[in-house]
Curated annotation (Swiss-Prot):
It comes from Rhizobium johnstonii (strain DSM 114642 / LMG 32736 / 3841). Forms part of the ribosomal stalk, playing a central role in the interaction of the ribosome with GTP-bound translation factors. One of its GO terms (biological process) is translation. Belongs to the universal ribosomal protein uL10 family. One of its GO terms (molecular function) is large ribosomal subunit rRNA binding. Pfam families: Ribosomal_L10. Part of the ribosomal stalk of the 50S ribosomal subunit. The N-terminus interacts with L11 and the large rRNA to form the base of the stalk. The C-terminus forms an elongated spine to which L12 dimers bind in a sequential fashion forming a multimeric L10(L12)X complex. The keyword Ribosomal protein applies. This is Large ribosomal subunit protein uL10. NCBIfam families: PRK00099.1-1. GO terms for cellular component: ribonucleoprotein complex; ribosome.
């Protein structure tokens, strides 16, 4: 990589660190090209991105961002997974790490908070923003459904009572 390319890459990575909802740093030593391509495609499908960067360039790109505290994670062969949704990147990385022992999560960042590996794992267990919205909508709709059921119940019970009397009269 030439000096101009490095500057451009650092600038691009700096913008990524500033705009991302969450960033996950992991070791990928020993992972095959096929495994990395599979990982990248899964991350892309979920709305995130995976990049491999030189540690020195990543540390330079971190300067002046909220995630500057995670610069100590960049040792060895590291990859950077990020997404605008705070849950997507940790969830995809942890799901992929379950089936692939070559991906070892080191930590990450979410806003100004630097995360260790355990924090990334717990973040991955949280529901996504869309799932939370669906649950909230379900909770809002439930009382209305119950009220409609209670209001409709006496009328249906009355109809059953009249039907039972009608059958009783016919039988008699």
């Amino acid at each position: 990589m030439e000096r101009a390319e490095k500057r451009e890459f650092v600038t691009e990575l700096n913008e990524v660190f500033k705009a991302s909802g969450s960033v996950v740093v992991a070791h990928y030593a020993g992972a095959t090209v096929a495994q990395m391509n599979d990982f990248r495609s899964k991350m892309r499908a979920a709305g995130g991105t995976v990049k491999v960067a030189k540690n020195r360039l990543a540390k330079i790109a971190l300067q002046g961002t909220e995630a500057e505290g995670m610069s100590n994670l960049f040792k060895g062969q590291t990859l950077i997974a990020y997404s605008t949704d705070p849950i997507t990147a940790p969830k995809v990385v942890m799901d992929f790490a379950k089936t692939n022992d070559k991906i070892i999560v080191l930590g990450g960042a979410m806003g100004t908070t630097t995360l260790n590996a355990d924090a990334v794992k717990s973040l991955a267990t949280l529901p996504s923003l869309d799932e939370l919205r669906a649950k909230l909508l379900g909770m809002i709709q439930t009382p209305a459904t119950r009220i409609a059921g209670v209001v409709a119940a006496p009328a249906s019970q009355l109809a059953r009572v009249f039907a039972a009397y009608a059958k009783k009269d016919e039988a008699a």
